[in-house]
Amino acid sequence: MKLPIYLDYSATTPVDPRVAQKMCECLTMEGNFGNPASRSHVFGWKAEEAVENARRQVAELVNADPREIVWTSGATESDNLAIKGVAHFYASKGKHIITSKIEHKAVLDTTRQLEREGFEVTYLEPGEDGLITPAMVAAALREDTILVSVMHVNNEIGTVNDIAAIGELTRSRGVLYHVDAAQSTGKVAIDLERMKVDLMSFSAHKTYGPKGIGALYVRRKPRVRLEAQMHGGGHERGMRSGTLATHQIVGMGEAFRIAREEMAAESRRIAGLSHRFHEQVSTLEEVYLNGSATARVPHNLNLSFNYVEGESLIMSLRDLAVSSGSACTSASLEPSYVLRALGRNDELAHSSIRFTFGRFTTEEEVDYAARKVCEAVGKLRELSPLWDMYKDGVDLSKIEWQAH
């Protein structure tokens, strides 16, 4: 076993060696390095063939038509293109958008920008289980609603929303539905032939592919129109200009091919590891699982260790790569906005750690990590006067602390 141990697979995944091999074949003079837009010679034709093969591989994982897959630089760009693209194209129909308070910042910052442009946005509060239900969406729908954006799998707590049911609702009301699925590819089965989802964002680097490449699914029937956010050359049917990065696209295609073939077995294995880890750390008192215990992916365990400061715990776990909150914003000392939206108090939100398991996690690593967590929590609680008071039977919620 090598240290440190990587347990932050929701932040990013290492590139699968099979993916890296395919990518290397598209970089040098001996390989498939051509510009896919070069129509006049074989180098361009071969590159275009590789790009279209990858487009088919991505489409197959989610049961879509390859023509519905648009290449982007990642899920952040896909979210921007979907939300701004719809808002700008359909603004004459209405200026109301619905999303949730626990979306990724790529969605929330995009809707904030649209608010500055005169759009109105409703931010749904999740239940204590971290889920957004169709009933919540239905209650927020208005005559002028043009778009609903509710994610599939939450990046911080791993909860899984029922996007099929939300899609049935939005389609029946003539409202477009966008889903951020960055965290669900390779973890949860997606069937876009059946689901009434209009737009879906994908990322390669959350699915053992390279960083810097993603895709947006844009439904053809019924047709969804977007206003391009990037201009210059008219690539990707005018929706996203820019020379296509053949090596990254081929990498994403291969990553999604592997995900399709190995998802079922991999999820079972990871569920076993996650359960093993959770059982061991649950021997500690005052450990809380954040988000639904059932509607979640097994890859993600977000736990709060009461009477322990999350940052101190991370510092104590020097051999473990884990996170508190989302990697994009984990430098902030504010408690996680996702956990606050669940109704967790500041103390529990501050004491949360996200453990995420993946393809290369082993049983030995999980056992070592659980042992280290139990040791660190025990030591930190020994230093905590609040822990002493709790052990003495003091109800800390009833104490009025003096402000200073």
UniProtKB/Swiss-Prot annotation:
<feature type="active site" description="Cysteine persulfide intermediate">
    <location>
        <position position="328"/>
    </location>
</feature>
<dbReference type="GO" id="GO:0044571">
    <property type="term" value="P:[2Fe-2S] cluster assembly"/>
</dbReference>
<keyword id="KW-0411">Iron-sulfur</keyword>
<feature type="binding site" description="via persulfide group">
    <location>
        <position position="328"/>
    </location>
    <ligand>
        <name>[2Fe-2S] cluster</name>
    </ligand>
</feature>
<keyword id="KW-0408">Iron</keyword>
<feature type="binding site">
    <location>
        <position position="243"/>
    </location>
    <ligand>
        <name>pyridoxal 5'-phosphate</name>
    </ligand>
</feature>
<keyword id="KW-0963">Cytoplasm</keyword>
<feature type="modified residue" description="N6-(pyridoxal phosphate)lysine">
    <location>
        <position position="206"/>
    </location>
</feature>
<feature type="binding site">
    <location>
        <position position="155"/>
    </location>
    <ligand>
        <name>pyridoxal 5'-phosphate</name>
    </ligand>
</feature>
<keyword id="KW-0808">Transferase</keyword>
<dbReference type="InterPro" id="IPR000192">
    <property type="entry name" value="Aminotrans_V_dom"/>
</dbReference>
<dbReference type="InterPro" id="IPR015421">
    <property type="entry name" value="PyrdxlP-dep_Trfase_major"/>
</dbReference>
<dbReference type="InterPro" id="IPR020578">
    <property type="entry name" value="Aminotrans_V_PyrdxlP_BS"/>
</dbReference>
<dbReference type="InterPro" id="IPR015424">
    <property type="entry name" value="PyrdxlP-dep_Trfase"/>
</dbReference>
<dbReference type="GO" id="GO:0046872">
    <property type="term" value="F:metal ion binding"/>
</dbReference>
<feature type="binding site">
    <location>
        <begin position="75"/>
        <end position="76"/>
    </location>
    <ligand>
        <name>pyridoxal 5'-phosphate</name>
    </ligand>
</feature>
<keyword id="KW-0663">Pyridoxal phosphate</keyword>
<dbReference type="GO" id="GO:1990221">
    <property type="term" value="C:L-cysteine desulfurase complex"/>
</dbReference>
<keyword id="KW-0479">Metal-binding</keyword>
<comment type="function">
    <text>Master enzyme that delivers sulfur to a number of partners involved in Fe-S cluster assembly, tRNA modification or cofactor biosynthesis. Catalyzes the removal of elemental sulfur atoms from cysteine to produce alanine. Functions as a sulfur delivery protein for Fe-S cluster synthesis onto IscU, an Fe-S scaffold assembly protein, as well as other S acceptor proteins.</text>
</comment>
<dbReference type="GO" id="GO:0031071">
    <property type="term" value="F:cysteine desulfurase activity"/>
</dbReference>
<feature type="binding site">
    <location>
        <position position="183"/>
    </location>
    <ligand>
        <name>pyridoxal 5'-phosphate</name>
    </ligand>
</feature>
<feature type="binding site">
    <location>
        <begin position="203"/>
        <end position="205"/>
    </location>
    <ligand>
        <name>pyridoxal 5'-phosphate</name>
    </ligand>
</feature>
<comment type="pathway">
    <text>Cofactor biosynthesis; iron-sulfur cluster biosynthesis.</text>
</comment>
<dbReference type="GO" id="GO:0030170">
    <property type="term" value="F:pyridoxal phosphate binding"/>
</dbReference>
<comment type="subunit">
    <text>Homodimer. Forms a heterotetramer with IscU, interacts with other sulfur acceptors.</text>
</comment>
<dbReference type="Pfam" id="PF00266">
    <property type="entry name" value="Aminotran_5"/>
</dbReference>
<dbReference type="GO" id="GO:0051537">
    <property type="term" value="F:2 iron, 2 sulfur cluster binding"/>
</dbReference>
<keyword id="KW-0001">2Fe-2S</keyword>
<dbReference type="InterPro" id="IPR016454">
    <property type="entry name" value="Cysteine_dSase"/>
</dbReference>
<protein>
    <recommendedName>
        <fullName>Cysteine desulfurase IscS</fullName>
        <ecNumber>2.8.1.7</ecNumber>
    </recommendedName>
</protein>
<dbReference type="InterPro" id="IPR010240">
    <property type="entry name" value="Cys_deSase_IscS"/>
</dbReference>
<comment type="similarity">
    <text>Belongs to the class-V pyridoxal-phosphate-dependent aminotransferase family. NifS/IscS subfamily.</text>
</comment>
<dbReference type="InterPro" id="IPR015422">
    <property type="entry name" value="PyrdxlP-dep_Trfase_small"/>
</dbReference>
